[in-house]
Amino acid sequence: MEYRGEEGRPRLEVGLRDIPNGPLSQKTRPPSSSSSMVTRTVLSRALRSATRSPRALRGFATAHNAYPITEISTLPNGLTVATESHPHAQTATVGVWIDAGSRAETDKTNGTAHFLEHMAFKGTNRRSQHALELEVENLGAHLNAYTSREQTVYYAKSFRKDVPVAVDIISDILQNSKLETSAIERERDVILREQQEVDKQLEEVVFDHLHAVAFQGQPLGRTILGPKENILSIKQDDLSSYIKTNYTADRMVLVGAGGVTHSELVKLAEKNFSSLPVSSNPIPLGRLSHPKTAFIGSEVRIRDDDLPTANIAIAVEGVGWSSPDYFPMMVMQSIFGNWDRSLGSASLTSSRLSHIISENNLANSFMSFSTSYSDTGLWGIYLVSENLMNLDDLTHFTLREWTRMSIAPTISEVERAKSQLKAGLLLGLDGTTAIAEDIGRQLVTSGRRFTPQQIESAVDAVTVDEIKRVAQKYLWDKDFALAGVGSIEGLLDYNRIRTDMSSMIY
């Protein structure tokens, strides 16, 4: 079992000072780009083209499609069934993606979704915990689940002949879990130990605080595990209420990838999921079912001089999954990339920022990120440095490179970033579990699925002028959220750092 952030790696999620406008309330006008309107038209045309059904490329006659096709059906109760079949695959991944995570909780019930994920493997009305574990082991299958801010996922990987059993097990877990009081008490201690382990991981702690300040007082600002007091107080009624409210057919997608046909999975869905309830007010997948989240320029600093490093995350408001600026923002993030001093010379990397930081010994590592949710996102960078006397230079040169994107990104770095992004996105679809994850996430968040070919076309359509446009829109002279943990005495105050968001010197 695991809980994961929206970038696919394990991620927990916390405040707290709004920044007054002060002298920075008078905005500096960003540099203009004369050809941005033309570029936006070209990109929009490419994105519209990418959403059309893919056409098989053919020179000579062929008896089958060149690429696997994602087939989608909807049952009468609203459950979506999606498959990408590979006829020669001997294994398959099947799973249920639910449009509900910690974002569907309240302050009082925060942590329920993750707690429920833990309880899923503790026995059902048909299978005891031991019988469930033994059945999965005898199949040679892999059964897992994870919770994120916006999704809860239960999936299994098995031999293709065992797909019916795998679907039956997942259905049983979702609809018939016992939620016994004794099991709840045992799992409470497990989750508390898990929370202690996560609190030791500085990166996770910083990103929790970053979400808390950027989306403070709102569902996205809460952690996935929930606060300790909630973990200690969650009861059976809380878990049952969450299931009743969120585990409805119209908010679920049953996904199959690999050795499973669409017709087979539809029949299995009809057999195992037809009795799922429907929301009182069904909302189509990809449509917002909650109020728009507001991004707040603010900061939190947790100084601990016993830590040898400063751990700092800075982020502006990013874009949601369905935004037309999603791929340009991903390309811009790829321009900065990641760097770690322990992995080799910066002279071998393409990022200008990595050269600056390496040559001046400003940081141990950095990681750029573009995290998307259904209606908003976080775009930024995570910095780790033991050069505590030069934290002001570290933030200055980092934000100076950000502002350069509004003025003078180069063709070579944009093209290189596009190639790296395509490689990362497409190579990440290796294996049935990765494909199922991609299908489920896209359908839940946007109501559709971009094929690998459509993704490649959308990335290829991003130009230098498009990078300038999104940089001017999302970076230039914008408020940011900042979270710092560790030896951060040398970190300048918010307003001083904020001035670098509109510097004409690069």
Task: Give the ranges of each region predicted by the language model.
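Histidine-acidic residue clusters that define the catalytic metal-binding segment
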Residues: 61-72, 212-252, 273, 286-292, ...
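A structural supersecondary motif
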Residues: 313-323, 336-389, 408-409
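C-terminal regions of mature proteins
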Residues: 38-52, 253-255, 420-506
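N-terminal amphipathic/basic-hydrophobic helices that include classical n-h-c signal peptides
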Residues: 1-36
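Acidic/histidine-enriched segments that form metal/cofactor-coordinating
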Residues: 38-60, 98, 124-125, 129-246, ...
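N- or domain-start disorder-to-order transition segments that initiate the globular core
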Residues: 40-49, 57-91
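M16/MPP (pitrilysin/insulinase) zinc-metallopeptidase core fold and M16-derived inactive scaffolds
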Residues: 88-157, 335-339, 343-362
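An aromatic/glycine/proline-enriched structural segment found at the starts
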Residues: 61-63, 216, 220-232, 248-325, ...
